[in-house]
Every structure is written in structure tokens, then in C-alpha cells.
């Protein structure tokens, strides 16, 4: 049995364990909001309006568990998500049509907006990924789609396939009033009572939110029109992203982990024990395992990673 859903030598590990994921995660939520029907599902059937921070942390927990959680842990989380989604429906005010939250097209959009954002942000931030590794990341993430009720063939499994999908769905995307409000929430989120310990860090969030907005595709920023466009913005955003990544990478793991909820931290601690038992050197933390020269994989680990 694999110690983690994704092996440390996987492309998934290289992307998801990078600290640029904070920007990638917020970018993903901003991109997802441009699908008018999907946005109505979030607006009507979630607590996003009162707890956008919680939504981000739940997404981080899902990414964590489906990366370094045990296969059994990820299966349990996926089953829970599918049960919740199966019970939820909403009405599109533009058409009056009722929709289920777990409709295939909506699930595909959410998946693609997430993993495309994760990959594109990682590459832009300077994560060293070859074109083959980028394709492998999307192929690996097609397996993750099963946790929300999709099959691997429902979603793009290469960069070329992802580009074709995003081009095909682009005409249906637009910034509704709800989407613009969602982006403003993400730029300056409220801190709910159960996360009050993070309140002192709120002023530090705006640069992260603004950078997440800045690394959206240009067409998406034009749709929103929430922040002004400036000359040289693309190059400046890339430079700022790389600077932020370097700063976050310098934060010791014990302090960095304070921003995650208890369940996510507990999952990481359990993963550390399983990896140690499997022969991985984890004394320098999970991030050290991303470098192929800094971990010792047990016999057969590469075969398991391909399975």
C-alpha cells in the first residue's frame, strides 16, 4: 500500500508542496467564479459570503489529503464530498433552471480551473517543471477527479488538452455581480470567529489576494475590472510572485503550518510517519522531499508512483 496518495517523486508533489500554492489557490477561486452557473452554486449553497477564508482552507485540506494523505483517508474525504454535493441544488436566476451541484459539467469546470491555476502559477513562480512533467501533473490530477465523482477521462490529461478545454469554455465565462463580489471578498476577506487567531495577519493578506488577481489571464482581469491595469503588469506580477515565493520558502515549517487547520496538520503528521516507515528521509520536512537528490526512496517507489 502506498504511504501517500501521490509519491514524493510525482509531479503532483512538486506543485502542491510549493508555497506558491497560496497564490494559486486564490487564483483558482477567482477563475472558478467566472462560470455563471458554478458561481450561483457557490453563492447560494455555501458559506462563502461569510467565510471565504474557510473556503480557502477547506480547499487546502482537500489538496493536502489528496496529495500526501493515505489512500484510505482520501477515499473517505471524497465520499464525504460526494454525499454533500449530491444533496445540494440551486436555481440559476438567469434561466430559472434548477441545477445539482454535482452536475458533470460544473465538476469538470471546477477541477480544470483548480489544476490549471495550480500548474500555471507554479510554472510562473519558478517551480522547475519540464513540459513532460507539466503533462504528467495533469495526468496525475485526472485521478484526483474521481474523489468528486468524475472519471479520469472526463477531464484534460495534458497541457494541450487543458488549453483546448479552456478555449472551448471561454465563451460561457463572464463576471457576474456575484463573481465580482466574490473577488472583493478574496482581496479583503472577513475573518470568522473560529479563525480569529488569524485576524492580526489580515493586513498581510491583501498583497497575496492582489497578486492572485494579477496572475489571472488578462481576459479574466478585463472581465472583472476590479483592480486597475498598469503598464508592464505581466512582468511585474511574475517578479512579485517569485519574490513572494522566495519569502514564503524562507519561513520555517513549524511557523508556516500555523495557518492550516488542525485536520490538515494532523494529516501531515500522519503522512510523515508513514513515509518514514516506508524508508523516506523526512527529517528535513516534506519540502525537502521534492528534490530528487535529497530523499532516499524505498525499492519499488518509482513503480508505485507510476501505478
Predicted regions located by residue number:
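Mature, function-bearing regions of proteins
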Residues: 1-307
